[in-house]
């Protein structure tokens, strides 16, 4: 097919929209299907062909059987290295369940309580609303009901910046809520970073040290590292994306470079192989117990982590086009919990620039599946659903055709949304001489940008984010656009407010309406530094 891919926002929506549902009348579970290597191959390879996927890793966990583990394709286009069962992928937001488990272990040790106020352990913690500061609990850090808007603060750490985890605490008082506290669901990463700071404060170990010594080592996750900074060797999955034209998500598949930094780790930092993640799924379904009987956490804590806390979405349930659409989707502690054909599914997705990973468990069947892809499209979600259906004997459904159809519809919608393209400047011109826009501007949660004027041209540098450096082009009245290097991230539109012949304010938004939510330029509010 011609290239089109979804971003992390869309991958998450596709995952929630197609991964789980209440069974409709007449559907019945067959006995767990015998799915051998040839059967898995027959499910995976058509997806790879349809989506032009360079590489896939698969793990399947079943009762009384060793895990099925296999790699497909190549680590990086243009290079010889093959994906195998020890190839490391960035598991991104699948890391959130590790942060939740770390907190559960500290709860077991009575060092914290789930319903302790965060300020009990982090006295410097502040939210925009002082009342919310006092009410926010350890549990609230994990369940996406803080009132913060989607992706708030993500520009602190994505792409790589000079910010450190403590800067999340400094930023939070300036991030305005989009809704009331505990009034609804909006996905965030920043509060998981705060959770990582809390783990360090209480345990005396950095989040990375805690994950490595308390989880990865006991589990024998020998390929895994808690942060990309610790990756070594060549057996690492590459990153691939379609960078346009006209927008990211379309055009030929290209190799891109990782752009996440260590500040992101407690929300999305772990790198692991499918061999590793099979062990994680096994200990999850065993209620925290290792094969030797040792408990990393109790069954009570296992149940606590899977208990729904926040309603994510609801619908009328399955349709012929989407037979696993959830009736209700919820978020627990580091996991989505929802229905899949009438039974509970515990799952998560994770997206980085150039990679998407999926994990899912059907605990009542003892079945777990992980699918890792080295592209940023939705192929891993379709493969996951196909594997789950095959493993549970669900009614036949053509997930390849469905995924291709959904992708084409998304492409059509995208093209309609950017009709005329994103490279057509709106009418209007700057009202001031270009030198008047030059200077240093500061945002209270992100930091500074510097705009320079040289020989009649403007340029911008985001001070904490080195890769965000670009010439500026006029883009309507008192507005300009960036052209960041290919693969560096989404471009932004800058709008200057002018009063009495001087700039008084600078705001931004992503150029493309389809930009991933982590490019939260719209949350920035700069003022000139005098």
Residue ranges of predicted features:
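N-terminal secretory signal peptides and thylakoid transit peptides that target proteins
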Residues: 2-19
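Boundary at the C-terminal end of the N-terminal hydrophobic targeting segment
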Residues: 28-32
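Short, conserved catalytic-motif segment at the N-terminal edge
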Residues: 33-91, 111-113, 120-121, 127-128, ...
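Short, surface-exposed loop or secondary-structure junction motifs
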Residues: 65, 69-77, 130-353, 358
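Peripheral terminal and inter-domain segments
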Residues: 312-313, 321, 343, 385-530
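Short, well-ordered beta-strand elements
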Residues: 347-348, 358-361, 365-374, 506-507
């Amino acid at each position: 097919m011609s290239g089109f891919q979804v971003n992390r926002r869309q991958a998450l929506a596709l995952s929630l929209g197609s991964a789980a549902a209440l069974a409709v009348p007449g559907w019945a579970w067959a006995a767990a299907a015998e799915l051998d290597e040839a059967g898995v191959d027959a499910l995976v390879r058509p997806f790879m062909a349809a989506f032009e996927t360079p590489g896939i890793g698969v793990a399947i966990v079943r009762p009384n059987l060793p895990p099925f583990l296999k790699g497909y394709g190549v680590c990086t286009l243009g290079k010889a290295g093959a994906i195998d069962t020890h190839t490391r992928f960035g598991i991104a937001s699948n890391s959130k369940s590790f942060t939740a488990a770390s907190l559960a272990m500290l709860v077991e040790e009575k060092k914290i309580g789930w319903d302790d106020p965060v300020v009990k352990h982090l006295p410097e913690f502040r939210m925009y609303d002082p009342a919310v500061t006092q009410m926010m609990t350890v549990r609230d850090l994990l369940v996406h009901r803080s009132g913060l808007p989607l992706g708030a603060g993500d520009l602190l750490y994505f792409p790589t910046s000079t910010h450190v985890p403590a800067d999340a605490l400094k930023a939070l008082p300036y991030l305005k809520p989009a809704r009331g506290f505990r009034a609804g669901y909006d996905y965030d990463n920043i509060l998981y970073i705060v959770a990582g700071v809390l783990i360090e404060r209480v345990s005396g170990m950095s989040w990375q040290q805690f994950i490595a010594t308390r989880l990865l080592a006991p589990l024998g996750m020998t390929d895994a590292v808690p942060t990309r900074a610790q990756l070594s060797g060549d057996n690492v999955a590459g990153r691939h994306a379609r960078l346009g034209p006209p927008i990211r998500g379309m055009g030929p598949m290209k190799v891109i470079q990782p752009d996440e930094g260590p500040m992101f780790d407690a929300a999305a930092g772990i790198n692991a192989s499918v061999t590793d993640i099979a062990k994680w799924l096994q200990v999850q379904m065993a209620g925290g117990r290792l094969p030797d009987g040792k408990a990393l956490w109790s069954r009570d804590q296992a149940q606590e982590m899977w208990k729904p806390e926040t309603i994510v979405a609801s619908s009328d349930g399955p349709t012929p086009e989407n037979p696993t659409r959830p009736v209700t989707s919820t978020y627990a502690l580091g996991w989505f919990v929802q229905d899949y054909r009438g039974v509970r599914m515990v799952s998560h997705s994770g997206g980085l620039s150039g990679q998407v990973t999926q994990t899912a468990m059907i605990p009542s069947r003892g079945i777990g599946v992980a699918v890792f892809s080295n592209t940023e499209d939705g192929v891993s979600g379709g493969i996951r659903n196909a594997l789950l259906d095959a493993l549970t004997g669900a009614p036949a459904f053509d997930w390849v055709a469905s995924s291709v159809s959904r992708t084409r519809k998304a492409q059509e919608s995208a093209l309609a949304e950017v009709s005329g393209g994103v490279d057509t400047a709106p009418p209007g011109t700057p009202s001031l001489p270009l030198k008047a826009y030059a200077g240093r501007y500061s945002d209270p949660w992100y930091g500074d940008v510097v705009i320079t004027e040289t020989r009649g041209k403007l340029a911008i540098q985001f001070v904490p984010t080195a890769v965000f450096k670009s010439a500026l082009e006029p883009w309507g009245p008192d507005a300009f656009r960036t052209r960041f290097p290919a693969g560096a991230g989404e471009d932004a539109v800058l709008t200057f407010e002018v009063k009495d012949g001087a700039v008084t304010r600078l705001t931004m938004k992503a150029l493309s309406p389809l930009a991933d939510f982590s490019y939260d330029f719209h949350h920035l509010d700069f003022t000139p530094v005098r």
